[in-house]
Amino acid sequence: MIAGLLLSILLFSQAAPLETVVASLNNRAITYSEILQEGELLNIENNVPPETPLSPELKEKILRLIFFRIILSEEAREQEITVDEQLVRKSAENYMKNVYMKAFIKKYELTDFEFKTIIKMRLITDKMTTNFIEQKFPNGNKHSKEDEKKVIEDWENNLLKRQKVIIYSMP
């Protein structure tokens, strides 16, 4: 009887894993489940099954991407840069056409508001990045995708230098 009780406690304690904080950006904790959620959503966006395992290198890139999105969302708010709600709604509808999306939303128990907030952050990041590229290469100056990638990478690094970033080990 006691063995059964201990087994029950062990099983139930395994059902709800603790959140592991993998980083902090300006005192905002970033959890491992956020890395996994973002990774699954990136897989879905690229028409890859969401449960496809994430390599350690990809997890690091995802963490940087999360940092970048948070920073740009804050900068957009400060600069009063927004995206049209109709665009957010239309993008949400497009995401919902993906065969994996309903299961993703159910798995992470996302409300409609939370789902649209995720999409809105992506759209704001895209808009801020487009604005930055247009400033760096004005009047349609010719440039390669590599030039663009390098400029964005430098921008990300400079933005990160101005933040309080702590990175812990990732499972």
Where are these regions (language model features)?
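N-terminal targeting/tethering segments
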Residues: 14-119
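Hydrophobic membrane-targeting alpha-helices
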Residues: 8-11, 75, 131
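Cell-wall glycan
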Residues: 121-123
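Residue-level marker of intrinsically disordered, low-complexity segments enriched
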Residues: 7, 19-20, 163-165
